[in-house]
Amino acid sequence: MSARAHALDQIDTALAEVGAIETSLAAARRGQNPGVNRGDLARRFHTIAHAGTGHHAFAPVQELAALAEKVTDGTDQSILHTAGEIEVVQHAADVLSLLLRDMGHQLLGRRGADVTPAAAALRERLEHMLMAGRR
C-alpha cells in the first residue's frame, strides 16, 4: 500500500470515529440517551489522535484530538450531559472532520481550504477548558 493510500485509509478511520461521536451527541440531544459516556468519547478521540502516526500532515489533527481526549477523559460511568459540554465536543468533532476532509482533498491533489482559523479557535477553546478544570 502506498503512503498516500495508507494516509487516506487513516483519514477514513478517523472520520468513522468522528461520525460515531456525532451520532452519540445527536442521540443525547434528541433525548434518546441521558448524556454521552465520557469514556467512550475519550477512546474515540484517542483513536483519532493516533491516526496517521508518522505522517506529518496529521499533526494538527493529532494535537486537537489529544486535547479533546483530555477534556472528555473520565471514567466509563461518567456522563457528559450539560449543553455546554456537548457543544464543545460537537465543535471538536466539526473541526476535526473539516481538517480530515481537507487533508483528504490535498492528498488527492485538490486545493485545500484554509482551516487554520477553525483549528486555532478550537485549540484555544479546549486549552481554556483544560485550564478552567485545573482550578
Name every feature range the model reports, one short phrase each.
Residues 21-33, 52-55, 71-81, 99-110, ...:
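Secondary-structure edge/capping motif, primarily at the C-terminal ends of alpha-helices
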Residues 1-44, 54, 126-135:
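Long, amphipathic alpha-helical coiled-coil segments characteristic
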Residues 36-41, 54-72, 84-98:
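Short, well-ordered alpha-helical segments
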